[in-house]
A protein has these predicted regions:
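Long, highly charged, low-complexity intrinsically disordered interaction regions
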Residues: 12-90
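Short coil-to-beta-strand transition motifs
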Residues: 1-5
Length: 90
């Protein structure tokens, strides 16, 4: 299983009936499998609300979609609390 951290760039698709998402994330680090700074993440995330520009950690399998290229098929998502000074709210 691969763990990937990134900032939510945008929600490309959301099926409200089954909570299936297609997301675009801006990667927080360099990954060998990534073809650039962005990665598509797909998966079903029940009882979870995404906020654009927030940092998330995804766990899943890297897949090669025949039409859309490299994606992370995620089964786990967690918000990441940033630990730098700019992230602190007073």
């Amino acid at each position: 299983m691969q763990t990937v951290e990134g900032y939510l760039n945008k929600i490309i698709f959301h099926n409200k009936e089954n909570n299936y998402y297609i997301l675009s994330i801006f990667l927080n680090d360099k990954y060998d499998f990534a073809e650039g700074d962005y990665l598509s993440v797909v998966g079903t995330f029940n009882d979870f609300e995404f906020v654009e520009d927030d940092l998330y950690s995804f766990k899943g399998e890297i897949v090669q979609h025949r039409k859309y290229g490299i994606q992370l098929s995620a089964i786990v998502v967690e918000p990441v609390i940033e630990k730098d000074k700019e992230a602190l709210v007073w």
